[in-house]
From Swiss-Prot:
SMART domains: Ami_2. InterPro entries: Amidase/PGRP_sf, Amidase_domain, NAMLAA_amidase_2, Peptidoglycan-bd-like, PGBD-like_sf, PGBDSf. Belongs to the N-acetylmuramoyl-L-alanine amidase 2 family. Residues 40-152 form the N-acetylmuramoyl-L-alanine amidase domain. One of its GO terms (biological process) is peptidoglycan catabolic process. Its EC number is 3.5.1.28. It comes from Bacillus licheniformis. It is found in: Secreted. It comes from the Bacteria. This is Probable N-acetylmuramoyl-L-alanine amidase. GO terms for molecular function: N-acetylmuramoyl-L-alanine amidase activity. Gene3D superfamilies: Peptidoglycan recognition protein-like, PGBD-like superfamily/PGBD. Residues 1-39 form the signal peptide.
Length: 354
């Protein structure tokens, strides 16, 4: 069993507010995105620099190849999985910070999560599942909750989450139940409203209105409140685009996909301008409108220079926090992760913002 060290950070408004957790309904998996930092390094950061920088962020556990640092008590809130009121996992609503434990996996110097770290995380999470009576389908990614690209390897390959759940079930002596990557069943009425062909009413009409706004047209009948073939076709198109089961049935996983599509459609109304050239940490710091443009685009893609700080760290200065946000973005999209903004990073950002 992984060694768990209770090493709580001091109570403060930024990463350990001392608020009581409403319930433990799930476990949200993260990665630290700080190559080479150990679990203890992370704990010390959140007990010092994070507070000094007035950054709202934390998690309950940090796991590396050797141990797990328990830095926030389980019964308290940690700021790990809430982003501008987004929560796409129904059983964690309305705010995953108040309904879930956060587990961060440390990253090796080469940007990977070591097998021993994953093993330790599985042992920790299995113990937490046993303690709080959770099934493996209550283990989700940060990505599932807010659409943030975390943990990056598990976002690139959702099969890694499935493998992790199976590992946890094996440790608990259970058989794994097949579940979706987002840990929500399209046909489970307990997870939310289910809409399908043949149904009608206000819920259907609202869904149709949202589909049209998100770019999935209903040219013949529009939002008429009847779930017919045209609505099925629009839902299937949405599901295919999101990479989920395309059955034409609206349920929790389709709701998540629709919410993401709505956010994307809203972002398209904005014209994005990003600078040419190279931007990096220099002395004195590079600054000005061009840097603000880079920071604003990063924030729109959920890679905040300093989430929770004033304007989420958008200050017009290309410092270490902006470089770190760029590096996290680069890691997610397979670019050279050096924290330097250049032509390839610009092109990828613009492709995602369009």
């Amino acid at each position: 069993m992984v060694k768990v060290i209770n090493n709580f950070v001091k109570v403060n408004q930024y990463d350990r507010p001392g608020l009581k957790l409403a319930a433990v309904k799930g476990i949200v998996m993260h990665w630290t995105a700080t190559p080479g930092a150990s679990a203890l390094n992370e704990r010390n950061y959140f007990n010092g620099t994070c507070i000094a920088d007035k950054r709202y962020a934390s998690a309950h556990y940090f796991v590396d190849r050797h141990e797990a640092q328990h830095i926030i008590p389980d019964h308290e809130v940690a700021y790990h999985a809430h982003d501008q009121n987004r929560c796409y996992v129904s059983f964690l609503k309305p705010n995953a910070n108040t309904t879930a434990l956060g587990v961060e996996m440390c990253v090796e110097k080469d940007g990977t999560i070591h097998e021993e770290t994953i093993r330790n995380a599985a042992e920790l999470v299995a113990d937490l599942c046993k303690t709080y009576g959770l099934s493996a389908d209550r283990i989700v990614r940060h990505y599932d909750v807010t659409n943030k690209g975390c943990p990056t390897p598990w976002v690139r390959d959702a099969g890694q989450l499935s493998a992790f759940r199976k590992r946890v079930d094996s440790l608990l002596g259970r058989k794994t139940v097949s579940v979706s990557a987002a840990s929500t069943s399209q046909t489970s009425s307990s997870s939310g409203i289910i809409l399908k062909k043949g149904m009608s009413g206000s819920h259907v009409k609202k869904l149709q209105t949202r589909l049209v706004a998100a770019g999935f047209s209903l040219p013949k009948y529009g939002a008429d409140g009847s779930y017919g073939d045209e609505t099925v076709h629009a839902v299937v198109s949405l599901q295919k685009k999101a990479g989920i089961k395309a059955d034409g049935i609206y349920g929790p996983s389709t709701e998540k996909a629709l919410s993401a599509a709505e956010a994307s459609a809203a972002g398209k109304s904005k014209t994005w301008t990003l600078p040419d050239g190279i931007y990096k940490v220099k002395n004195p710091l590079m600054k000005g409108t061009a840097v603000t443009q880079i920071q604003t685009a990063l924030a729109a893609l959920y890679y905040y220079p300093d989430k929770g700080a004033k304007n989420n760290g958008i200050d017009g200065y290309y410092g270490m926090k902006t470089a770190n946000a760029v590096k996290r973005f680069q890691l997610m999209y397979g670019l050279g992760a050096d924290g330097i903004y250049g032509p390839k990073t610009k092109a990828k950002m613009l492709s995602l913002l369009k």
